[in-house]
Amino acid sequence: MGSSFGKNFRVTTFGESHGGAVGVILDGCPPKLKINIDLIQNELDRRRPGQSKITTPRNEDDKLEILSGLKEGITLGTPIAMMVRNKDQRPGDYSNLEQVFRPSHADGTYHLKYGIQAGSGGGRASARETIGRVAAGAIAKQLLKNLFNTEILSWVKRIHDIDSQVNKNKLTLSKIDSNIVRCPDDKVAAKMIKRIKELQQDGDSCGGVIECLVKNVPSGLGMPVFDKLEADLAKALMSLPATKGFEIGSGFLGTYLRGSEHNDSFIESDDISKLKTISNNSGGIQGGISNGENIEMKIAFKPTATIGKEQKTVNADGKEVLMKAKGRHDPCVLPRAVPMVDSMVALVLADHLLLHQAQCSIIK
């Protein structure tokens, strides 16, 4: 319970941060889809620890192992099982935290729910769990790209109080990945990197905002009322570790506008299936259904909860204790969270694509 996501394009992740391996079982992927395995590994490399001086120093190569579901790079329509082995576990780093509830971690709430919790690395609450999501999301991205040329681009918009403004018309994956913080504005990226390093040296951390743009979105994805596309996107993205906020389109800023300013008027077209709007305050979704415009979202991530400063907390007996984290951690999660955001968006869109085809493509 709680480890599966999706209806038709369904993922189930498994494993803990300091266990033997982490992975995913992807069920419902259409057969005969050609998969570039190198692209899956590339997404895992973008997510892996130890990739720069502003990420956790945990040294994992995150080499992908595909156990089932593919034959010579072609999907069989059967469950696709993928796994990455953990090779640099150091559970001893957490020996002083046994039965201690770290502030703003899942230790306390896991203990309250289950009466027991993983003693090291956060267990299932660790960002290491997202390896399975990223692997499955890489397949979803290829499905969407092959069928509709859909492109999902996420980048770091803000770190702490350092914000960026990006020309979305010129945005590319190579530009996003051109620096270690994954902000396509090089001048702002340099300031972000400096801030992260300063906080890291002080034993502290920071959060920020990731922005996501989806191009070439098929119209008609999503369902009314309880299965609205933006509702499922919100659930997917808010399920990522450290997320605390979600906006789509104009978001909260839209509340400052009048209806006459906010409405997205349609443009006359000879092809009703390719309607465009003058503005895109709706963020590509109206009535819970995609309208074919770009989907635009922002996701807020809190500061990394594991910090190098001494803090007061309590243990499993409710007694106050002083603690100082020794484990390896990211001073800011956002640079590595970018491919996680991409993957969750891809999984939602792939799932809704299959749902749409199942309901609306039988009778022409």
UniProtKB/Swiss-Prot annotation:
It catalyses: 5-O-(1-carboxyvinyl)-3-phosphoshikimate = chorismate + phosphate. One of its GO terms (cellular component) is cytosol. The keyword Amino-acid biosynthesis applies. FMN binds at R124, A125, S126, G287, K302, P303, T304, A305, T306, R328. Pathway: Metabolic intermediate biosynthesis; chorismate biosynthesis; chorismate from D-erythrose 4-phosphate and phosphoenolpyruvate: step 7/7. It holds the Pfam family Chorismate_synt. NADP(+) binds at R47. GO terms for biological process: amino acid biosynthetic process; aromatic amino acid family biosynthetic process; chorismate biosynthetic process. It comes from the Bacteria. The keyword Methyltransferase does not apply. Reduced FMN (FMNH(2)). InterPro entries: Chorismate_synth (IPR000453), Chorismate_synth_AroC_sf (IPR035904), Chorismate_synthase_CS (IPR020541). Its cofactor is FMNH2. Its EC number is 4.2.3.5. This reaction introduces a second double bond into the aromatic ring system. Homotetramer. PANTHER family: CHORISMATE SYNTHASE. HAMAP family: Chorismate_synth. Belongs to the chorismate synthase family. This is Chorismate synthase. The lineage of its organism: Bacteria, Bacillati, Cyanobacteriota, Cyanophyceae, Synechococcales.
